[in-house]
């Protein structure tokens, strides 16, 4: 992993919280309705901290971008990477074609349904656009099932139109199955919560992965930000 740009650390938090506490709790936290010092988050940080203390994350990840974080995978020093399908092409070009696979983020509590992360990119018309009529036609064109499939294939993503043909890429096929069978979808920490909250929260997550023994101080600091932003 490379956490220099923070959002990759948030992916770990999201998945762990979704697996431990479920979607409703997670979104309540994203909406600012739940404290970051809530005891239900203790297990999330316990599991995460245990991984960090045992050295399961590469060293110096806070100084690496997610792109630079691919190097340990390519040179054989790392075995797994929590990352979107868009990384597959890079790994294959680096010599791992036929040598990598995919598995769903593990279940932690069998009583909690499997919610997944599936951030969705969207295209919009600016409110002050001069030619909205043609812009709407272009959006309609982009939304067509066949066009969605073309765009998704180039980007290494899944199409958002459920009428689009099934993807041919083996990893996208598995991803499509996982998302289709999930209880529901979260977008991602920095999309699901207030932008300022996300920035401060992700800074805390990155610090926690480096210094898990600072958990209490980090959560207290993040909680202070939550109270200021959401006034709850």
What role is predicted for each listed range?
Residues 54, 93-156, 203:
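Extracytoplasmic/periplasmic substrate-recognition and gating elements
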Residues 20-43, 93-94, 107-115, 166, ...:
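Short, solvent-exposed loop/beta-turn-alpha elements that line the ligand-binding surface or hinge
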Residues 66, 83-88, 119-121:
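Beta->alpha turn/N-cap motifs
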Residues 31-61:
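Glycine-centered hinge/linker elements that transmit conformational signals in sensory
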Residues 75-83, 98:
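Alpha-to-beta junction loops
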Residues 1-33, 49, 78:
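Extracytoplasmic/periplasmic solute-binding protein
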Residues 180-232:
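Conserved C-terminal helix/tail region of periplasmic/extracytoplasmic solute-binding proteins
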Residues 60-74:
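Short helix-initiation/N-cap motifs at beta->coil->alpha
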